[in-house]
């Protein structure tokens, strides 16, 4: 539920019935989950866990996170990466009106190819795998591990002007984030993007 533009209503409480609570970790300016709250949140039985900040959002299977201990560190890394994307695009991070990127894995990728979207669903997962509640999936460890998400984000946000440019320039946000924000040397960041 979002408050309309220029309204100052702030957060509101709503009541829902007949729902199952899902784990939620929030690093939003107005709603930060504490470490103690996370210990309770991660045990909620909903099938998907939500991680959200002012710059990034993702949903992952609850089986990945019921023993996950580092949500704040993870979300700080994602925020740093999203700041890099915004900087590269020439947008001040504070001027974004929505999360820069929203990710979610799925069982099947439609049409067998990657694509842009909100959420971006470019990662597969196997629901029957025993993740022991502390998955080592890259989404929970290293926001720069997979270039695909940044490549598709580039398609969504960059305007290409020249023939052949479309599949090249979209790789630059990933190289920028890895080099400038995460300290990977430029040649490696560029080669792996």
Question: What does each of the following model-derived ranges do?
Answer:
Residues 1-45, 50:
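Extended acidic/polar, glycine-enriched regions
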Residues 37-40, 47-193:
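Catalytic cores of extracellular degradative/oxidative enzymes
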